[in-house]
């Protein structure tokens, strides 16, 4: 029986054996069906290759002779062509006979001398017939018949005889003989007796064979016989339908159908007739290299080891001497291009998951080119889906065989992955697509180019790769646990965790794909209920906020949207994916709906609803051409169009214009729409905002097929919660008359609701009713009576208002009808623009040509204003220059007429030394005594330097006359306001500038040299004058002349080199000068975005004018027609800049294997004392704000600026105007992305001053650890804040700081200390306060009023508090404290104490004192903390006496060390702090927790509860 179509039969399934009885079965009904035709099996191919390896001409010819039954031997030249054909015609019986015969000649094909899988020949199934392959070209004849050989006796030289029955072939050639037989000499008869006679005749003939060959090649029966219908069938297959050469499956099926139709006509049974599949390799072996590869694959399959090596292969087949030659031949032929044929070969083995090809790749992989491995993997990628042991073995073999292939597959560059995916080549897409974890682990490597996390997780969610997600999350958690167990801080980075992503961000990507399976896994690991921010725009997931319908609230809401949009645009320009929680957008992909999404979306949305997470309707801008409604988009057939990894939209962060709700309506899926409406309405959303921009939707859903969706949209099953019911849910229908009419028909009750007119106007403009600002104001006067009112009752229903806004002719009538309304207030153009800007100016996707032109005109107006100011300055300079020339000409005339009568003018010039003129150059020399010279006409150029006359002998300088007629004192013109530095400093020898003389006589000491000068000067005068002038020019003048813009008291330049910050809405920060002398940062803000900004700035200026040096000062403000300018303190950077620079330097040093000693933060901090002062700068700044009733609400390292090597606080808030630099002042809702906001901010609860305390605690940790965060890495930071799980291990060496910070960052805001209490913490105690605390503690211990109880004494000796009487706790002192302190010191402290009290030391006892003979003796209980405190206090108080006693005592080994620590009280305290480091903090914590108000009196201001 032939193999089934499309599958390859294993070798043992092809070994058919017929006995004599079976030969006669099924002979009725048109002939015998026992004529079994064999296909090209592995057995025959193995034999073929072994025959070739023998290189024995006689054997090869015998094989051909056996196959054809020809009397003559073929020529050797025909062997290469005929070998493939003869094996196709060789039955398995003949294969066995040939092996037995050759074994008798001591020629072996196998090492074990047997072909084991041929020994057990299964019984054949003779119900089907398969056509034989075509005969060789040389033997094709016009007639061919097939008959059956019954029994043949095989005889060998060893006496081996066997009776084997099988079918062979007989070919008839009309040109040579009538009939030629293949393996028999007679035809089969219908009875067994005839068959036996024929067998006997065959045996007799075989005995006469010269070669002792078991077959007689001569056909002694020459008689012709009639051709049966079965033979006619075979003849058609062989000559008319050569299926062996047909590779097209369609053509093959057509031919098969034609054959069956012919057989029906001839009344031949066709139920059991089938045509065997086309052989993989053409029967004629024209491609020798492919034949070798196929043979090697089969030979490799005979070995058991899957990871087969070439050495093992050669050793196994070592008897075949020529095998190495064929291996080398195979290696040389690999350079030929036969990839198509290789793919055909691979398409046979790989779909069957045959281990032969795995063994072949492992064995010969080093010889195979990467293109061949790519061909194998191409078939693997197309045919294999789910992983198993075979697929893993195949991938391991392919990756290990060729480095180039491995590099291509394991490279995670998105462009390369896209390219391979487009070509259907194997890549990491295969394990992701079919969720194969083991395969993913093999391919993914952190050492290679890492995947962009957003792109990777997008693919994971798209294909619902659950197993891979579970593996990555578990692996990440395991790594973190391992880091914690090893005592390290878990610090993820791209090299360690390249696929790490914030859980909230991953949930957003899930929402983009409606991947409920991945979202369910996330919910198992993370609790999003408490960690979800208020406006988390996933696609977007968010919690609703209360929005009232007042004018102020609406304006604020729209302004927030504008800021959000501007921020997205800025991120888009910088190609940076925003990581902010409110406005995070990952992949702005097209919103598509297909059959897969149809199943996914309702489940995902219901999962979000059950988890109390509500969906925002914003998604990416969609396109109908990308919508595929076929489920096959997730199968292999559709490959490239949908994925689009390399699409530019992957990083596009533009604002959405098509909402999720609109796409669901267009998709018209009932289940998805119901789930979405349920989620939105439970979250407090209303449709008026969700669909306000959807003008195209209004047209789309008016069609009849959307009737059901509209009914669902307006049914009563999804009511709005009460606090949102004031907003009309149908405002978005304002622009569509058809939908309004439909609304009136199905839901008339909605007309009685109150209408928010501002929402309605926004909807009208968004729907395109007014496409430009001009058109809006053109119609405004007609409708202002309506548009100026906040709300309208049922009196003016929706349809009437629609009529008014759409039909101008009815406006006057309706206005007269409703004039009894209360008189409205008038909105000015600015307020109307706020509404207009929301729907036009800031929405690029719906902006019209008019609005774009208006924006362009605004920019041109600004440029023209700049040009106008520039021209004005030039004109002024030109006019001033003209006036100067006139004055100079007048001076020249006067000087010429009075030359002969001129007397020297005594001028006192100080000797230009470096002490007197700090700005002079080192090359300057003292001015020599002037010599009278001839006069030279000069052009006076103003120099802003005054030379002071200092000698009393010099006569008083007369006042400058009004007219330049006297030659005694030249007039100094006023410096032009806009004169440049070049005009002030350049002097030429021809026109030296005159000296400017101060008219006020001053007599300094010591007197400088006096220099007499006349109008006539020498040639040295210009040089001297120039030198003196240059040395006196202040640096400030140089700075002033760099700034070309003057606004009030501000001077600055808009050149890029002077820009130190940029923000949204065109906000810029420049470096400039205020009042011509003070450097400031000048912030330029648009008036249009906040008309009340000037008032807010005035408040901030008033606030910061108060005496506080720890906050940024708001110096002054100026404004022009377009901008407001705010002057701020100019700083040198921020704490974040300082830390980030260190991180960059460390990274570079690590990569270059260098030691980095240039730690900027460490150098900036310096000593511990300076660190305390820097921290106090921050605390004092926050304390000042809190005293003024201000909550900063956005403290982070970026807002801690550096000025004069001290910290000051910035970003005090300025009307949502955000700047991305150190000059950032915002009061918008904090993002929380960096982890500097407490849980109540993230959950949008009431914000108090404790918010700043939490942020300050995080900043202190950040400062003291060089940039680390108290809640760990960003991946878990949000979750740790919400679950109150700080990670303070990096600061565990400083327990006092840990205690303070842990209080400041407590989740419970009531547990956080105030700024006053922070400054009282032991962390800020100096030496005096520590001594004061010890004294107070000792006084408490001595209290006689019962304040110090035994219970309190027990508490201060235990680490933990115990509630029960019998419970025990770990003692604070691990051993007696005398073992911690030097014995010599203990002894002398005790002696000194008893000397002072008049007693002596008698050692330890259960009591603290003992009275003997009227004397009181003191001693210490070394297990008691209070005695340790008493010892410390006594040592501090009497350190000099104890030092003296020790110095007089016999010397000891550590005597000098003890003496050194007794030099001062501070050293004594340091000594005990080193021996018992946690004592003061321990007592502070115990007293603060357990002391009542009476006991706290001892501590005054040291402890405040």
From Swiss-Prot:
Bias type Polar residues, positions: 159-172, 978-989
Q: Where does ATP bind?
A: 1060-1068, 1083
Q: Where is the active site?
A: 1194
Coiled coil spans: 846-892
Name the Gene3D superfamilies for this protein.
KEN domain (1.20.1440.180), Phosphorylase Kinase, domain 1 (3.30.200.20), Transferase(Phosphotransferase) domain 1 (1.10.510.10)
- What Enzyme Commission number does this protein have? 2.7.11.1
Name of this chain's protein: Probable serine/threonine-protein kinase irlD
Native organism is Dictyostelium discoideum (Social amoeba)
């Amino acid at each position: 029986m032939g193999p089934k179509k499309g599958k390859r039969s294993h070798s043992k399934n092809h070994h058919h054996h017929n006995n004599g009885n079976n030969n006669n079965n099924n002979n009725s009904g048109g002939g015998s069906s026992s004529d079994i035709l064999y296909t090209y099996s592995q057995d025959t191919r193995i034999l073929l290759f072994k025959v070739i390896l023998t290189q024995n001409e006689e054997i090869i010819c015998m094989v051909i002779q056996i196959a054809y039954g020809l009397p003559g031997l073929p020529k050797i030249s025909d062997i290469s062509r005929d070998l493939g054909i003869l094996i196709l015609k060789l039955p398995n019986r003949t294969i066995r006979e040939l092996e037995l015969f050759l074994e008798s000649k001591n020629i072996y094909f196998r090492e074990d001398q047997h072909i084991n899988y041929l020994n057990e020949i299964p019984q054949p199934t003779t119900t089907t017939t398969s056509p034989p392959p075509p005969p060789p070209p040389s033997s094709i004849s016009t007639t061919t018949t097939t008959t059956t050989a019954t029994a043949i006796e095989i005889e060998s030289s060893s006496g081996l005889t066997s009776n084997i029955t099988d079918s062979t072939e007989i070919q008839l050639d009309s040109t040579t003989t009538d009939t030629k037989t293949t393996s028999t000499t007679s035809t089969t008869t219908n009875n067994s007796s005839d068959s036996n006679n024929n067998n006997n005749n065959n045996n007799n003939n075989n005995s006469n064979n010269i070669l002792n060959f078991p077959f007689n090649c001569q056909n002694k029966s020459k008689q012709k016989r009639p051709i049966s219908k079965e033979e006619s069938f075979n003849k058609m297959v062989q000559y008319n339908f050569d299926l062996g050469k047909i590779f097209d499956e369609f053509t093959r099926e057509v031919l098969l159908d034609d054959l069956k139709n012919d057989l029906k006509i001839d009344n031949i049974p066709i139920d059991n007739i089938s045509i065997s599949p086309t052989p993989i390799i053409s029967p004629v072996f024209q491609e020798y290299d492919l034949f070798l590869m196929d043979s090697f694959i089969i030979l490799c399959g005979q070995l058991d080891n899957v990871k087969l090596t070439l050495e093992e292969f050669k050793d196994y087949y070592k008897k075949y001497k020529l095998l190495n030659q064929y291996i080398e031949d195979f290696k040389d032929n690999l350079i030929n291009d036969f990839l198509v044929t290789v793919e055909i070969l691979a398409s046979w083995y790989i779909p069957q998951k045959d281990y032969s090809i795995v063994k072949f790749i492992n064995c010969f992989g080093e010889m195979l080119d990467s293109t061949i491995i790519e061909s194998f993997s191409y078939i693997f990628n197309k045919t294999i889906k789910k992983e198993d042991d075979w697929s893993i073995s195949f991938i391991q073999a392919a990756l290990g065989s060729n480095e180039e292939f491995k590099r291509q597959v394991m490279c995670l560059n998105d462009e390369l992955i896209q390219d391979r995916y487009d070509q259907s080549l194997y890549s990491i897409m295969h394990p992701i697509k079919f969720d194969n974890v083991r395969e993913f682990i093999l391919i993914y490597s952190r050492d290679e180019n890492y995947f962009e996390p957003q792109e990777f997780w997008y693919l994971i969610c798209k294909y619902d790769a659950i197993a891979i997600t579970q593996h990555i999350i578990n692996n990440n958690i395991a790594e973190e646990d391992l880091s914690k167990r090893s005592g390290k801080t878990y610090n993820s980075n791209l090299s360690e965790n390249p696929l790490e992503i914030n859980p909230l961000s991953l949930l957003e990507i899930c929402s983009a794909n409606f991947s409920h399976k991945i979202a369910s896994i996330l919910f198992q690991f993370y609790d999003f209920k408490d960690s979800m921010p208020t406006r988390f725009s996933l696609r977007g997931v968010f919690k609703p906020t209360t929005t009232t319908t007042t004018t102020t609230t609406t304006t604020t809401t729209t302004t927030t949207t504008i800021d959000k949009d501007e921020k997205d645009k800025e991120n888009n320009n910088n190609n940076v994916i925003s990581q902010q929680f409110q406005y995070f957008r990952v992949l702005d992909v097209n919103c598509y709906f297909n059959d897969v999404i149809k199943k996914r979306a309702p489940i995902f949305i219901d999962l979000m609803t059950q988890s109390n997470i509500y969906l925002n309707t914003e998604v990416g801008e969609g396109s109908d051409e990308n919508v595929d409604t076929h489920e096959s988009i997730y199968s292999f057939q559709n490959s490239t169009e949908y994925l689009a990894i390399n699409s530019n939209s992957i990083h596009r962060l533009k604002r959405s214009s098509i909402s999720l709700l609109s796409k669901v309506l267009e998709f018209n899926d009932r289940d998805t729409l119901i789930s979405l409406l349920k989620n939105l309405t439970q979250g407090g959303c209303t449709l008026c905002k969700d669909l306000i921009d959807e003008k195209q939707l209004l047209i789309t859903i008016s069609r009849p097929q959307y009737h059901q969706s509209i009914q669902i949209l307006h049914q009563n099953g999804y009511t709005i919660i009460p606090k949102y019911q004031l907003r009309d849910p149908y405002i978005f229908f304002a622009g569509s008359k058809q939908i309004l009419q439909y609304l009136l028909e199905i839901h008339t009750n909605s007309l009685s609701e109150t209408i928010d007119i501002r929402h309605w106007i926004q909807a009208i403009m968004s729907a395109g009713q007014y496409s430009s600002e001009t058109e809006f104001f053109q119609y405004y006067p007609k409708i202002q009576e309506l548009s100026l009112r906040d709300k309208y009752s049922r009196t003016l229903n929706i349809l009437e208002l629609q009529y008014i806004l759409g039909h101008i002719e009815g406006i006057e009538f309706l206005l007269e009808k409703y004039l009894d309304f209360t008189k409205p207030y008038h909105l000015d153009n600015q307020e109307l623009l706020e509404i207009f800007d929301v729907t036009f100016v800031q929405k690029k996707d719906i902006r019209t040509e008019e609005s774009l032109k208006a924006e362009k005109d605004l920019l041109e107006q600004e440029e023209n204003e700049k040009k106008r100011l520039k021209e004005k300055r030039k004109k002024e300079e030109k006019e001033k220059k003209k006036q100067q020339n006139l004055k100079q000409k007048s001076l020249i005339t006067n000087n010429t007429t009075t030359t002969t009568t001129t007397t020297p003018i005594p001028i006192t010039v100080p000797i230009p030394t470096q002490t007197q003129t700090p700005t002079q150059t080192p090359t300057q020399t003292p001015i020599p005594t002037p010599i009278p010279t001839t006069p030279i006409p000069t052009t006076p150029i103003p120099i802003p330097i005054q030379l002071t006359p200092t000698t009393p002998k010099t006569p008083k300088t007369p006042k400058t006359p009004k007219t330049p007629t006297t030659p005694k004192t030249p007039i100094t013109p006023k410096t032009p306001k806009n004169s440049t530095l070049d005009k002030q400093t350049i002097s030429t020898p021809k026109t030296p500038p005159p000296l400017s003389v101060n008219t006020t006589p001053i007599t300094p000491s010591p007197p400088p040299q006096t220099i007499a000068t006349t109008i006539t000067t020498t040639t040295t005068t210009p040089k001297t004058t120039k030198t003196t002038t240059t040395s006196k020019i202040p640096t400030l003048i140089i700075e002033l002349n760099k700034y070309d813009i003057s606004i009030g008291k501000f001077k600055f330049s808009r050149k890029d080199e002077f820009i130190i910050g940029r923000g949204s809405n065109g906000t810029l920060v420049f470096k400039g000068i205020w009042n011509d002398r003070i450097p400031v940062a000048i912030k330029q803000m648009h008036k249009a975005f906040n008309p009340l900004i000037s008032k807010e700035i005035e408040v901030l200026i008033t606030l910061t004018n108060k005496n506080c040096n720890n906050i940024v000062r708001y110096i002054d403000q100026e404004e022009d027609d377009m901008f407001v300018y705010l002057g701020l303190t100019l700083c040198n950077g921020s704490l974040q800049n300082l830390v980030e620079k260190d991180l960059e330097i460390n990274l570079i040093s690590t990569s270059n294997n260098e030691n980095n000693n240039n730690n900027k933060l460490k150098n900036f901090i310096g000593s511990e004392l300076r660190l305390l002062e820097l921290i106090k700068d921050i605390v004092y700044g926050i304390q000042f704000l809190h005293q003024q009733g201000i909550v900063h609400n956005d403290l982070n390292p970026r807002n801690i600026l550096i000025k004069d090597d001290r910290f000051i606080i910035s970003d005090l808030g300025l009307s949502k105007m955000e700047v991305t630099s150190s000059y950032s002042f915002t009061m918008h809702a904090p993002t929380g992305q960096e982890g500097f906001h407490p849980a109540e901010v993230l959950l949008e609860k009431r914000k108090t001053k404790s918010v700043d305390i939490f942020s300050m605690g995080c900043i202190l940790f950040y400062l003291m650890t060089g940039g680390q965060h108290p809640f760990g890495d960003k991946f878990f930071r949000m979750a740790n804040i919400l679950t109150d799980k700080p990670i303070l291990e990096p600061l565990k060496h400083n327990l006092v700081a840990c205690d303070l910070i842990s209080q400041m960052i407590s989740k419970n805001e009531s547990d956080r200390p105030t700024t006053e209490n922070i400054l009282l913490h032991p962390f800020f105690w100096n030496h005096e306060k520590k001594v004061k605390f010890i004294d107070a503690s000792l006084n408490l211990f001595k209290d006689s009023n019962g304040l110090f109880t035994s219970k309190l004494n027990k508490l201060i000796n235990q680490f933990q508090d115990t509630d029960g009487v019998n419970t025990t706790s770990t003692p604070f002192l691990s051993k007696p404290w005398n073992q911690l302190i030097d014995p010599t010191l203990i002894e002398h402290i005790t002696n000194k104490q008893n000397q002072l009290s008049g007693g002596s030391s008698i050692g330890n006892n259960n009591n603290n004192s003992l009275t003997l003979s009227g004397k009181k003796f003191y001693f210490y209980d070394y297990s008691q903390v209070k005695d340790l405190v008493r010892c410390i206090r006594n040592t501090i108080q009497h350190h000099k006496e104890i030092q003296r006693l020790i110095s007089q005592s016999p010397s000891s080994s550590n005597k000098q060390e003890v003496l050194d620590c007794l030099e001062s009280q501070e050293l004594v305290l340091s000594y005990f702090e080193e021996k018992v480091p946690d004592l003061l903090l321990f007592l502070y914590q115990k007293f603060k927790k357990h002391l009542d108000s009476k006991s706290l009196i001892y501590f005054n201001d040291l402890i405040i509860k």
